[in-house]
Each structure stands twice: as structure tokens, then as C-alpha cells.
Amino acid sequence: MPKLIILPHKILLPKGGVFNAMKGESILNVALRNNVEIEHACEKSCVCTTCHCYIWKGASSLSICEEKEEDVLDKAWNLQFNSRLSCQAKINNKDIEIEIPKYTINQ
């Protein structure tokens, strides 16, 4: 079973965490199921950037970043090469390590 590793975040998860994930489950759904309240203003419909995260390990095993997600990501605060929307990035067979940005456009 793949794991979602979330690096420490000052507000949402001060000590970080490791959570079991199911293949095909989005990063956001794994986090929410484990009471990590990543903001998701658009209710997972891929129109905002509040669930933006950085993928530090396992990016190649995530679902492909579709054009719509890429277009929305262009509006994200502090966009980086490893940015994904956690509502769209689906976990496959490998462990994934992410960082939740310090800020979002809504914060």
C-alpha cells in the first residue's frame, strides 16, 4: 500500500505525517481522510489553486498532469517545477512525499 508523506507545516501538520493511500486516490482525499485540512475552495473541481502542493518524491508515479490542471497551476502562489494540485494528482503504486506551501492565494 503506498504512503503519503506530508512534510511538517506550521499550521496544518506541525510534525508532518505518514498516511496510507489507496491506488487511484487523490493526494487531497488522503489528506482530508486523515484530518489534514488542506484548503480546497473549489471543492476539488480544478478551478482554484488553494490545494496546490509541492511533490518532492514519487512524482513520476502520480497520474499525469492534464492541460486543465496546468492552466490552473499557472495562477498558483510560488509555482515551482514540482507543483501539482492535490485534488488532481492521483497516487499509484509508490510512496509520495509532499510539502504544503506556506501560503495560498486565499490565505
From Swiss-Prot:
Stored Pfam families: Fer2
Cofactor(s), names only, from the UniProt record: [2Fe-2S] cluster
Gene Ontology BP, a term: P450-containing electron transport chain
Keywords carried by this UniProt record: 2Fe-2S, Electron transport, Iron, Iron-sulfur, Metal-binding, Transport
Residue span, 2Fe-2S ferredoxin-type domain: 1-104
GO cellular component, one term: cytosol
UniProt xrefs under SUPFAM superfamilies: 2Fe-2S ferredoxin-like
Annotated disulfide bonds: none
Residues involved in [2Fe-2S] cluster binding: 42, 48, 51, 87
Cofactor notes: Binds 1 [2Fe-2S] cluster.
InterPro entries: 2Fe-2S_ferredoxin-like_sf, 2Fe-2S_ferredoxin-type, Adrenodoxin-like, Adrenodoxin_Fe-S_BS, Beta-grasp_dom_sf, Fdx_isc
GO molecular function, one term: electron transfer activity
Family stated for the protein in its record: Belongs to the adrenodoxin/putidaredoxin family.
Function recorded in the entry: Ferredoxin are iron-sulfur proteins that transfer electrons in a wide variety of metabolic reactions.
Protein name (Swiss-Prot/TrEMBL): 2Fe-2S ferredoxin
Organism whose genome encodes this protein: Buchnera aphidicola subsp. Baizongia pistaciae (strain Bp)
Taxonomic lineage: Bacteria, Pseudomonadati, Pseudomonadota, Gammaproteobacteria, Enterobacterales
Gene name of the record: fdx
